[in-house]
Curated annotation (Swiss-Prot):
Any matching Pfam family: YbaB_DNA_bd
InterPro entries recorded: YbaB-like_sf, YbaB/EbfC
GO MF assignments: DNA binding
GO cellular component: bacterial nucleoid; cytosol
Annotated SUPFAM superfamilies: YbaB-like
Gene3D superfamilies: Nucleoid-associated protein YbaB-like domain
Name recorded for this polypeptide: Nucleoid-associated protein Cgl0243/cg0297
Keywords carried by this UniProt record: Cytoplasm, DNA-binding
Record's function text: Binds to DNA and alters its conformation. May be involved in regulation of gene expression, nucleoid organization and DNA protection.
Keyword Nuclease carried by entry: no
Principal location: cytoplasm
Organism annotation: Corynebacterium glutamicum (strain ATCC 13032 / DSM 20300 / JCM 1318 / BCRC 11384 / CCUG 27702 / LMG 3730 / NBRC 12168 / NCIMB 10025 / NRRL B-2784 / 534)
Length: 103
């Protein structure tokens, strides 16, 4: 078995690093909207997990039933968080599979 060429390994590593940085930038530039209650509550989240907006339809604001609103807010946040995770997996997944070929 022949030893891999170090310059080739270094070039592959540099290419992977550039692809990783590009994927990270794409993730950071992504904005997703999570929702709950068929859109009655929405959470807008950036790729870094920062929440930039929360909207609540006045129909769900009931002082007698705060728990439902809390559940909807939590559901919308989780939905947005899952969408960010899916975007990250979509962008980073192919790169992690390619790392096996480095060594």
């Amino acid at each position: 078995m022949t030893q891999p060429d170090m310059s080739q390994i270094l070039a592959q590593a540099q290419q992977m690093q550039a692809q990783l940085q590009a994927a990270q930038q794409e993730i950071l530039a992504t904005t997703v909207v999570g929702n709950a209650g068929n859109g009655l509550v929405t959470v807008t989240m950036a790729g870094n997990g920062e929440v930039s907006a929360v909207t609540v339809d006045p129909k769900v604001v009931d002082p007698e039933d705060v728990e439902t609103l809390q559940d909807l807010l939590l559901g919308a946040f989780k939905d947005a968080h899952n969408k960010v995770a899916n975007v990250a997996e979509e962008k980073m997944g192919p790169l992690s599979q390619g790392m096996g070929g480095l060594f």
